[in-house]
């Protein structure tokens, strides 16, 4: 079994550095390739490919540990809440807290744990259940952007051929509708409404999923119906 045998790792000789594996382009070379790209892009079929099927579970892993053993992590939790109001999704979070009539997190550890549950659970705003592409991520002066929006901005910079900008997102089946709705909403806003968009979505092939095992390498579930998780590197080559 692969879990027991392991995989063959690449044998690294040394780190890549400038002049040994890495070429550093000078000012004139940078300008040359920049102009070459700009002169060719309108005649090429360019698409930006974005793997966006990852859930935010690992992003909030630490918070689940805090909720499980709050007394053990009281200092970490306190430090987190010292700057919680700087988080880009704080307004969304606080709105849900107010809706549920929860006391301020400044009361102490018990209230802080309530806030944390609201942050990650389905009873609250459930950010740990969402794909990272739909989470409020970047705070600007008068605007909070999600990663999908940032990828659209980036595509305008280097993936626009003529008046057409192409994007392809890989997302989980569960959230394709949410992604499509958000993209349709963004396309109506400036500067996205100044170009034509061709945005497509696909899902990761189930046949690339990895079988889950316990610490003793026993399959979780049954041989006929094992528990699987989406595969990692290389799983999106088909997409």
Enumerate the predicted regions with their spans.
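Polybasic, low-complexity association/targeting segments
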Residues: 1-11
